Protein backbone atom coordinates (compact mmCIF):
# COMPACT_ATOMS: atom_id res chain seq x y z
CA UNK A 1 0.00 0.00 0.00
CA UNK A 2 1.35 3.41 -0.99
CA UNK A 3 1.67 6.25 1.48
CA UNK A 4 0.84 8.91 -1.12
CA UNK A 5 -1.95 8.27 -3.63
CA UNK A 6 -3.78 10.10 -6.40
CA UNK A 7 -6.25 12.62 -4.96
CA UNK A 8 -4.35 13.22 -1.69
CA UNK A 9 -3.80 16.74 -0.38
CA UNK A 10 -0.04 17.25 0.07
CA UNK A 11 2.32 19.97 1.34
CA UNK A 12 5.65 20.74 -0.36
CA UNK A 13 8.51 20.52 2.16
CA UNK A 14 11.49 21.82 0.12
CA UNK A 15 12.29 23.70 -3.07
CA UNK A 16 10.89 26.77 -4.80
CA UNK A 17 7.29 25.87 -3.86
CA UNK A 18 7.99 25.17 -0.17
CA UNK A 19 4.86 25.48 1.97
CA UNK A 20 2.39 25.29 -0.92
CA UNK A 21 -0.38 22.71 -0.92
CA UNK A 22 -1.98 20.88 -3.80
CA UNK A 23 -3.75 17.73 -4.91
CA UNK A 24 -1.82 14.76 -6.30
CA UNK A 25 -2.76 14.26 -9.97
CA UNK A 26 -0.48 11.29 -10.71
CA UNK A 27 1.94 9.06 -8.79
CA UNK A 28 4.92 7.39 -10.46
CA UNK A 29 6.12 4.72 -7.98
CA UNK A 30 8.98 3.43 -10.15
CA UNK A 31 10.53 6.91 -10.32
CA UNK A 32 9.51 7.87 -6.73
CA UNK A 33 7.81 10.99 -8.08
CA UNK A 34 4.36 12.58 -8.12
CA UNK A 35 2.65 15.33 -10.12
CA UNK A 36 0.89 17.87 -7.87
CA UNK A 37 -1.68 20.38 -9.17
CA UNK A 38 -0.32 23.96 -9.08
CA UNK A 39 3.14 22.96 -7.80
CA UNK A 40 6.48 22.82 -9.70
CA UNK A 41 4.97 24.54 -12.75
CA UNK A 42 7.36 24.75 -15.73
CA UNK A 43 7.10 26.36 -19.18
CA UNK A 44 7.23 24.02 -22.17
CA UNK A 45 7.58 24.97 -25.83
CA UNK A 46 4.78 23.25 -27.75
CA UNK A 47 5.20 22.35 -31.41
CA UNK A 48 2.20 22.90 -33.67
CA UNK A 49 0.01 19.86 -34.35
CA UNK A 50 -3.25 19.36 -36.25
CA UNK A 51 -5.42 20.12 -33.23
CA UNK A 52 -3.11 22.34 -31.16
CA UNK A 53 -1.27 25.51 -32.06
CA UNK A 54 2.35 26.28 -31.23
CA UNK A 55 3.39 28.32 -28.22
CA UNK A 56 4.69 28.22 -24.68
CA UNK A 57 2.46 26.33 -22.24
CA UNK A 58 2.70 25.93 -18.47
CA UNK A 59 2.39 22.46 -16.98
CA UNK A 60 3.18 20.68 -13.73
CA UNK A 61 6.44 18.73 -13.61
CA UNK A 62 6.91 15.70 -11.33
CA UNK A 63 8.30 16.31 -7.83
CA UNK A 64 10.19 13.74 -5.76
CA UNK A 65 8.14 11.98 -3.06
CA UNK A 66 10.73 12.89 -0.41
CA UNK A 67 9.94 16.58 -0.97
CA UNK A 68 6.20 16.29 -0.24
CA UNK A 69 4.17 15.15 2.77
CA UNK A 70 0.50 14.36 3.30
CA UNK A 71 -1.50 17.26 4.78
CA UNK A 72 -3.04 16.33 8.14
CA UNK A 73 -6.84 16.09 7.72
CA UNK A 74 -7.32 17.93 11.04
CA UNK A 75 -5.21 21.08 10.53
CA UNK A 76 -3.56 20.85 7.08
CA UNK A 77 0.01 20.72 8.38
CA UNK A 78 2.49 18.15 7.02
CA UNK A 79 2.40 14.73 8.67
CA UNK A 80 3.95 11.31 8.28
CA UNK A 81 1.76 8.35 7.35
CA UNK A 82 1.25 5.19 9.37
CA UNK A 83 -0.92 2.15 8.82
CA UNK A 84 -3.54 0.55 11.05
CA UNK A 85 -5.78 -2.50 10.69
CA UNK A 86 -9.40 -1.34 10.97
CA UNK A 87 -11.58 -4.44 11.06
CA UNK A 88 -10.73 -6.26 7.82
CA UNK A 89 -9.15 -3.23 6.13
CA UNK A 90 -5.70 -1.69 6.30
CA UNK A 91 -6.07 2.11 6.51
CA UNK A 92 -3.67 5.03 6.39
CA UNK A 93 -3.38 7.10 9.57
CA UNK A 94 -1.85 10.56 10.12
CA UNK A 95 0.94 10.16 12.70
CA UNK A 96 0.45 13.76 13.88
CA UNK A 97 -3.22 13.56 14.90
CA UNK A 98 -4.17 9.89 14.60
CA UNK A 99 -6.90 10.74 12.06
CA UNK A 100 -7.70 8.23 9.31
CA UNK A 101 -6.68 9.54 5.86
CA UNK A 102 -9.47 9.07 3.31
CA UNK A 103 -8.58 7.39 0.07
Curated annotation (Swiss-Prot):
Name the SMART domains on file. KOW
Keyword RNA-binding in record? yes
User: Which sequence ranges form a coiled-coil region, renumbered to this chain?
Assistant: none
Tell me the PROSITE patterns matching this sequence.
RIBOSOMAL_L24
Q: Which GO terms describe its cellular component?
A: ribonucleoprotein complex; ribosome
A GO term for molecular function:
rRNA binding
Its signal peptide is none
Q: Which UniProt keywords apply?
A: Ribonucleoprotein, Ribosomal protein, RNA-binding, rRNA-binding
InterPro entries for the chain? KOW (IPR005824), Rib_uL2_dom2 (IPR014722), Ribosomal_uL24 (IPR003256), Ribosomal_uL24_CS (IPR005825), Ribosomal_uL24_KOW (IPR041988), Translation_prot_SH3-like_sf (IPR008991)
Q: Give the UniProt record's GO annotations in the biological process aspect.
A: translation
Query: What job does this protein perform?
Result: One of two assembly initiator proteins, it binds directly to the 5'-end of the 23S rRNA, where it nucleates assembly of the 50S subunit. One of the proteins that surrounds the polypeptide exit tunnel on the outside of the subunit.
Q: How does it assemble?
A: Part of the 50S ribosomal subunit.
Q: Which family does it belong to?
A: Belongs to the universal ribosomal protein uL24 family.
Which protein are we looking at?
Large ribosomal subunit protein uL24
| Species of provenance | Sinorhizobium fredii (strain NBRC 101917 / NGR234)
Amino acid sequence: MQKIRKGDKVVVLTGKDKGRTGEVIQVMPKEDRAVVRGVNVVKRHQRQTQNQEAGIISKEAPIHLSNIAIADPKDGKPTRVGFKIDGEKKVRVAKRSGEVIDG
